[in-house]
Amino acid sequence: MRRNSIFTKWWVKGSAVLVATAATLVFASPQQAIATPLKGVDSVTVSQSASNVVDIDFADGIKGRITFLEDGIFRYNVDPKGEFSEYATPRSKSHTAKIQAQPDTSDTYSKPSATVVDKGDAIEITGGKATVVLDKATGKMSIKSGDRVVVSESASLDLDKKGTVQTLAKEKSENFFGGGTQNGRFLHTNQTIAISNTNNWTDGGVASPNPFYWTSDGYGVLRNTFAEGSYDFGSTDSSTVTTSHSENEFDAYYFVATETGASNVATEMLQDYYKVTGNPVLLPEYGFYLGHLNAYNRDGWSTTSGQKKWETKGSKSSSEKGDVKYESGMSTGYKLDGTLAAETLNGEGPTVDTENMKATDFDRQFSARQVIDDYEDNDMPLGWFLPNDGYGAGYGQNGYYKTGGVNSDGTSSAERLNAVRANVDNLKKFTEYANSKGVSTGLWTQSNLEPDSNSETPWHLLRDFDSEVKTGGITTLKTDVAWVGSGYSFGLNGIKTAYDTVTTGANKRPNIITLDGWAGTQRFGGIWTGDQYGGNWEYIRFHIPTYIGQSLSGNPNIGSDMDGIFGGDPIISARDYQWKTFTPSMLDMDGWGTYRKSPMTHGDPYTGISRFYLKLKAQLMPYIYTSAASAANIDTGNGDTGLPMIRAMLLSDNSEYAASTSTQYQYMFGENFLVAPVYQDTQADENGNDVRNGIYLPNYGTDENPTIWIDYFSGKQYRGGQVLN
């Protein structure tokens, strides 16, 4: 197979009125019954207790408030109840995680003082470099950066009981970005996106929404809410933007750019978003290596027959036969009956409450340890390992299918807890072995976090998360339903709990991978895009703009399964290892597909190609980790603080072409690598050799002294300012 079109760039330098102010303005208007939309402004008052806060009385008794936080950041809240809650209302009182990293009163903010000016038909409210203009008659708002209007409402804010709708004017050349993990998209102009968890993992679905968007015209909006929403960026009316959330309050942070141009605006928008919601987490270095996930505590195995045949060819030719093992069970509730070997973490059987365990043996070849050995034997770099990723799988078999042991007050008996401790010790043994091979361990957090009060729960499936971290030594977590529910406040609270437990219990930076993210998720972990079918070009195609879009939405840490969790194909698998070498997270989600999901499954040339790219990623790790630090908003001295690892072309090129869908299948990986994955069959031969067209090479220099792009593998040079075919 030909290698992907991947270039590193070599930079070639070219020859290169305030009329009056008042604390309070009051206007006469007739008393009316409360109604929607807003019908006008009665008074505007600078708060006596905080000079950066402005209180607004709209007609019909509706209250509003503007809080200036920085030169280009303010909060606009219209609350019919007049309560102005500090934080968004969670979906449950038990959800304590917040969207914001700190309250508005924090000294983190400079809090510029506000001034209020009567302009006749309108009121101008200025704080720092941002000015909010309210129309007296309609309450319609517009925002200025200096003298430049960056956005204006084309209709009054509508506070209906069923939802709150803001209608904005859309400029012809204005482009829209953000919204979280919008599968298959990074540019949302003239489209409608769902700010809700659609549980659809393919093109057009939304895996981890984020109520944050920004535009090329110089403003961004973060809706401070956990309610579902919908953002129409000109789909219904090309001159109008309509954003709505299912709640009877408008609460939003506005980010106002001081500069123009897509790349400058994008940088400001991300910095402002991080100022309010917190910097992205810097994952541990091992988190950027390949991870392996499967269940090794549930099924039965044989070398002769079984429910599912798994063949591994390693470095043999893809045309030769490989090593074969057979697995049976693979579902919740499977119980060994004494005819098959048991899979285990360590190649060892249980020692506590073993009366229900019926297995022919506990052969190490069917263990999680053996899988680590497989990666080592095939010279494949591996960073982390989850041995319980499967329904009905724990991390030990002590108390195998034993139930009961629940006291009248819901606590567990000593015998029940002893089985849990024995299983944690089993996990600890596996962690120690994995660590000796340079591999970190973690768990899929599908079940409860501590021994539950259900007497019907088999003891070997009970969890003790605190002990898993402190004794078991895990530092990686992949969240699921029990942790993040449907997302929103449930999801944010779950991932914060996971982050806090590892950081306080183990005093280590965790590697947390989650689905159903929201605004603020970036403080705690990375995004996983969901369960998808591999084995087809579509799987690679739609993920490229997905990664770009997520990175423009404030979370630079993103990953997905190698060749999907289901299905599979040798060529697609190899191509996936190629391009995802130049992405943050890579997951071998094994046990569900047509083939074993690993880089050594299909034999050469596929095994060799996958090995080459995994080793290349290892060689590039200093570069990758430096880029990850920059993405975490850490100043590395390279001038790219706050920029994501996967960078849309518009982040370095202000041209209209770079900010269009013409560049949706390429990106910059860090500062110096342009990555253009092979994502379709253009004119492939039977071995998968193909070409890649439409590669845009920007020119940051001049026509006389252009940027030179160098093919990373061949050394061939290309002039910037062309589309390469």
Q: Where do the PLM segments sit?
A:
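Bacterial N-terminal signal peptides
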Residues: 15-26
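Sec-dependent signal peptide cleavage junction
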Residues: 25-37
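Bacterial Sec-dependent N-terminal signal peptides
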Residues: 1-17
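Aromatic- and carboxylate-enriched substrate-binding clefts and catalytic-loop regions
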Residues: 99, 153, 180, 384-610, ...
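A low-complexity, Ser/Thr/Gly/Pro-enriched, surface-exposed linker/loop concept
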Residues: 36-47, 67-121, 159-165
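Catalytic and substrate-binding clefts that recognize carbohydrates or anionic sugar/phosphate headgroups
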Residues: 58-59, 79-81, 102-350, 354-360, ...
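Aromatic- and glycine-enriched glycan-recognition loops and surfaces
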Residues: 263, 304-455
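Carbohydrate-binding surfaces of carbohydrate-active enzymes
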Residues: 48, 56, 60, 374, ...
